A protein has these predicted regions:
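Bacterial N-terminal signal peptides
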Residues: 5-14
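N-terminal edge beta-strand
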Residues: 21-38
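Structural beta-strand segments of beta-rich domains
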Residues: 39-45
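Aromatic/hydrophobic beta-strand junction motif of beta-rich domains
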Residues: 45-49, 163-165
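Membrane-proximal low-complexity regions enriched in glycine and acidic/polar residues
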Residues: 71-172
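Extended, hydrophilic extramembrane loops/domains of integral membrane proteins
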Residues: 170-200
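Short, aromatic-rich amphipathic segments at membrane interfaces
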Residues: 189-220
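Juxtamembrane interface at the cytosolic side of transmembrane helices
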Residues: 219, 227-243
Length: 243
C-alpha cells in the first residue's frame, strides 16, 4: 500500500500509458536559496502547449514518511489523539489547473498521475473509511501553505502558459519537482518536468545543521537565546508603574 501510494504521487504509472511528447518547461527562480530571513516566495512556471489542450501544473516537494498527530478539541482545549503514519507525505503539494480536473481528465487518468486531492489522499493511505482524516489533514496543510490544489492561476496566450505558486515559509532542503500536463479528450498528452533545488545558506544552513546533528544542544541553545532576548527587552523597555 505504501509503495503504491508513492508511485501514485510521482506519476510513475506513466510507463503503462501511451508514449507522450515533452512540454517545453522552465521555472523561475531556477534555484531557491533560503536565508535566515526567508518567509516564502513565488515560483513561476512557464511552458508551451498546443492550443486547445488543457494545462495542469503541479509542484511536488520531497516525499517522505511522516507521523501526524490528530488533535481534537475538547471545550477550549486541543488534545492530542490518534497518531497516523503517512506513507508518502510530500513537503509541498501545489496544483493549478485551467479548469476543474474532472472536466480535463477522466478519473482514472487523474488518479494514475497522482493529480488532485483524491489521489493525494490515496497515496497517503487516507482513502476509503479514512477520508475523515484526510479532510482534517488537508485543512491544516492548506492553512500552512503546504497544500493548494484547485482551478485557476494559469494564464494562456496562444500556446504559451504561465502559472504562479506561493511557496510556504518552511521548505526543507531538496528538490521541488515541477510538472506540467497537457490534457486532451480526458487523457494526458504531452508532459514536461523540471527540478528546482532548494538550499539553505548562511546562518539558516548552520542552524539547520546544528538542529540535525545535536538536537538536544540546539534546543537548549534556542531556549537560552529566547531567555536572553526577553531579558534585553525588559532592560530596554522597563515596565513603568502608574503613580
Amino acid at each position: 500500500m505504501k509503495a503504491a501510494g508513492l508511485l501514485l504521487l510521482l506519476g510513475t504509472f506513466a510507463a503503462a500509458l501511451p508514449a507522450r511528447g515533452d512540454l517545453r518547461l522552465e521555472a523561475s527562480p531556477a534555484e531557491i536559496r533560503e536565508g535566515l530571513g526567508w518567509s516564502g516566495g513565488t515560483l513561476r512556471v512557464r511552458g508551451e502547449a498546443r492550443p486547445g489542450d488543457g494545462v495542469v501544473v503541479r509542484v511536488l516537494g520531497e516525499v517522505r514518511k511522516e507521523t501526524w498527530v490528530l488533535k481534537r478539541q475538547r471545550g477550549p482545549f486541543w488534545l492530542s489523539g490518534e497518531r497516523v503514519l503517512l506513507a508518502g507525505a510530500p513537503e509541498v503539494y501545489l496544483l493549478r489547473a485551467e479548469r476543474p480536473l474532472e472536466e480535463l481528465l477522466l478519473p482514472e487518468e487523474a488518479r494514475g498521475a497522482g493529480l488532485g486531492e483524491g489521489a493525494l489522499a490515496e497515496a497517503l493511505g487516507l482513502a476509503g473509511d479514512r477520508t475523515y482524516l484526510a479532510s482534517e489533514l488537508f485543512r491544516q496543510w492548506r492553512a500552512s501553505g503546504r497544500l493548494a490544489a484547485g482551478e485557476g492561476g494559469i494564464s494562456r496566450q496562444g500556446g504559451h502558459f504561465e502559472a504562479a505558486f506561493a511557496l510556504p515559509a518552511s521548505l526543507a532542503e531538496g528538490t521541488l519537482r515541477v510538472e506540467a500536463f497537457a490534457c486532451r479528450e480526458g487523457r494526458i498528452g504531452d508532459r514536461g518536468t523540471v527540478g528546482v533545488p532548494v538550499r539553505r545558506e548562511g546562518l539558516a544552513a548552520f542552524l539547520a545543521e546544528a538542529a540535525r546533528r545535536r538536537p538536544a544542544l540546539y534546543g537548549l541553545g534556542a531556549a537560552l537565546l529566547a531567555l536572553a532576548v526577553g531579558l534585553l527587552v525588559g532592560v530596554a523597555f522597563p515596565h513603568r508603574r502608574p503613580h
